[in-house]
Design a protein with these regions (language model features):
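Membrane-proximal intracellular helices of multi-pass ion channels
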Residues: 1-449
Length: 449
């Protein structure tokens, strides 16, 4: 009996597939062959790392380079890759390549796992998603070797390049440089821009790249790009530009971050941190020394996340845009919610509000819980940590290893919740049919708001 033949809802299959990979991953990471000579990690640390990697977050209690051997780090790469594309996606790919036909439930599971709203060209889509991932990660690794091979030698340099390329494209934020992350390359344009490009491409979503392939590369029709693709590209450009500018403004005179850097390096760091803050988790500055207003800006950026259908977390930029557009139409008294010569349907609006509402409630619940378990930590750093976990970003103000075990358990739960998605989690827990009474439509009424 295969996994896809088990009688579960699509949401339940996705949730259990992630739990399965986390369990197997934590066991593999705890094996003696996976341990570095200097490792002092316990199974709890391995479990935390497995959750963070499968949920492509980037938080850790023990640094990868100091904890795992080369074999262990290869396991880490596999966990990040499977987490980024989901186990369901891999099973679906092998099933399709083997010529196996899928019933409606199996296809629905694959659609939900890869955030694909329709089945048109779905077989081509899933194959293209994996081919695109392999091609971009390989290209990114090749570019990074020009920096890492001179720094670490051929063997370690190539391995580090592959590790970071996979981590960046999957928006995981893990590196094997130690607790300082990539701070040593804060002024290196090759490393920063390559990682930023990988993060952006992974965060745009496979639907966007499939649209590019079918409309531009194959037909040369830019104007025929899907509405979703145009929206994602436009909003991504706006958010990255605004975030870079805000970081420049708030950190311009801060000597502990970018204050002492020349202008072009300030611009590079501000751009890179804006890119990584949306969902990747790499750090080229020390967040404990950043201005509080900068941390608040970053918390907002983490909440927004990237585009659906990719490796990014957060509520997704399309959901945020939908909420803003709907609020605008209500304020102006407009009958429809329009954008770029399109009217957004009510089901999309309802899903956007539901996603945001559940995300916000979980964030507040997680923040309340961790304030109770780790009351000695600064509130702004706890907010930063909770949002980083829930939005699967992975940045931290050096807080994760110092949290209590209860606090780390809360962070693990938030990472899992954020990776699966608020609505998918709730749907997987609610496996009941709507009663006749719940399905009734009563007379319309109103209440004061």
């Amino acid at each position: 009996m295969s996994f896809l033949s088990i009688k579960l809802t699509p949401s339940q299959r996705i949730m259990f597939s992630f739990l399965f990979v986390i369990l197997v991953g934590s066991i593999l990471l705890s094996l003696p062959i996976s341990q570095a000579d200097s490792s002092v990690a316990t199974y709890w640390d391995h479990l935390f790392t497995a959750v963070s990697m499968v949920c492509v977050t980037g938080l850790f209690t023990q640094a990868v380079s100091e904890t795992y051997s080369i074999f262990g780090q290869i396991i880490c790469i596999l966990l990040i890759q499977v987490g980024g594309l989901s186990l369901i996606g891999f099973i679906g790919l092998f099933a399709l390549r083997g010529g196996r036909k899928m019933d409606f439930m199996n296809m629905a599971t694959l659609q939900e796992a890869l955030s694909r709203s329709d089945t048109k060209y779905f077989r081509s889509f899933i194959k293209s998603a994996f081919a695109f991932t392999l091609a971009i990660e390989s290209l990114g690794a090749l570019i990074l070797t020009f920096q890492f091979v001179p720094d670490f030698g051929w063997q370690q340099g190539i391995f580090n390049s592959i590790f970071l390329a996979v981590s960046a494209f999957c928006n995981a934020g893990f590196d094997n440089f130690g607790a300082t992350s990539i701070v040593r390359y804060v002024d290196n344009p090759l490393v920063n821009l390559t990682l930023a490009a990988l993060i952006i491409m992974g965060g745009l979503g496979f639907s966007v790249w499939f649209d590019f392939q079918t409309q531009i590369l194959s037909r040369g029709h830019f104007k025929k790009l899907r509405f979703h693709t145009k929206v994602v590209l436009a909003i991504t450009a706006i958010i990255l530009s605004a975030g870079t500018l805000l970081t420049l403004i708030t950190e311009w005179k801060n000597p502990d971050t970018i204050g002492n850097l020349p202008f072009w390096e300030k611009l590079l760091v501000s751009f890179f941190q804006t890119v990584t803050m949306r969902t990747a988790g790499f750090a080229s500055i020390d967040f404990t020394k950043a201005e509080p207003v900068t941390l608040l800006i970053y918390i907002f950026q983490m909440m927004l996340g990237g585009a659906p259908g990719g490796t990014a977390g957060g509520i997704k930029i399309t959901a945020f845009l939908t909420i803003i557009l709907y609020a605008r139409s209500e304020i102006l008294g407009l009958p429809n919610t329009n954008f770029m010569s399109h009217t957004i349907d009510i089901l999309t609006i309802r899903k956007a509000f539901a996603t945001f509402s559940v995300f916000l409630m979980v964030f507040l619940a997680g923040l309340f819980a961790i304030v109770v378990t780790d009351a000695d930590k600064p509130l702004i750093f706890l907010m930063f940590e909770v949002m980083s976990a829930l939005a699967t970003v992975g940045v931290t103000a050096n807080l994760t290893p110092t949290l209590s075990m209860a606090g780390q358990a809360i962070i693990m739960a938030l990472m899992f919740f954020g990776r699966i998605g608020p609505l998918s989690i709730l749907a997987s827990l609610s496996n009941r049919k709507i009663s006749k009474k719940e399905g009734l439509k009563y007379a319309k009424s109103s209440m004061l708001v």
